[in-house]
């Protein structure tokens, strides 16, 4: 290695953290890190409280890191038909680039779904016996009653209270150090995400008795599939409430007095979103050039909306598909592999070449 570069190399993580605009949730970068000590010391932007928790609970950090892929995939599912599709940047420690420097509705959703993802990942790891600091919910013991009568707590109830508590301590740590509008917004949306997971905690039971008479029941609490949380937060995104800081700077109020004050379950934002039509570094917009659009749709994924009126290119592609499926007794369905030709429509690039500049 070149001698001058050899001297600089040990300082690159610090240099990177200094050069990149500060984004609150640098812990998202944990999905790409290695061992716990390397992760705790080199993830840019972690505050001291987050590093303390990271060193103290390496097994929890592994669960959080694995969970990043899950909630980013859910974000991409929810936005799959929109101009901004929750695409991540592998070489950016914020995952989403400058998008999160804006206090937009999209930023609100990302903070909420990521906070929810941490709760879900930690709680699941607790129930699976992967964490030293928690296990199944210790409070769910003995006998209890519901609308169907008496039952015994059994099995392994998901310890969601631990997941919520740890997620709040870790995720909110950096926001609590700031008193600005963005910090307050992020804290609110983080909490909304945590509450969303808990909202879908459901009681599951197993019956015991002769011929399934259910004379005895054993029950436990279980989290629903994360898709339910994603769908719920998506509805909250569509109904997100624009707010402004109050006069003393300790909270916010609705920007439009015709709207009700946001509840703890609502998502809030300060800034209007860009249209995401063209690549814009400052707005965190990747643009829609090259995105696949639906020629027959009238929704957000239509070629007219997705391509922002620029038009689209059409290419003929072939794909392998199942065909001539037949049911065979008993009990299988057998199909042939067939080649299918179809048209794929992709959005044209703007006439200006600026869109092609990499972010």
From Swiss-Prot:
One of its GO terms (molecular function) is cytokine activity. It holds the Pfam family wnt. GO terms for biological process: animal organ development; canonical Wnt signaling pathway; cell fate commitment; neuron differentiation. GO terms for cellular component: extracellular space. Palmitoleoylation is required for efficient binding to frizzled receptors. Depalmitoleoylation leads to Wnt signaling pathway inhibition. PROSITE patterns: WNT1. Ligand for members of the frizzled family of seven transmembrane receptors. Probable developmental protein. May be a signaling molecule which affects the development of discrete regions of tissues. Is likely to signal over only few cell diameters. Belongs to the Wnt family. This is Protein Wnt-2. The lineage of its organism: Eukaryota, Metazoa, Chordata, Craniata, Vertebrata. The gene is WNT2.
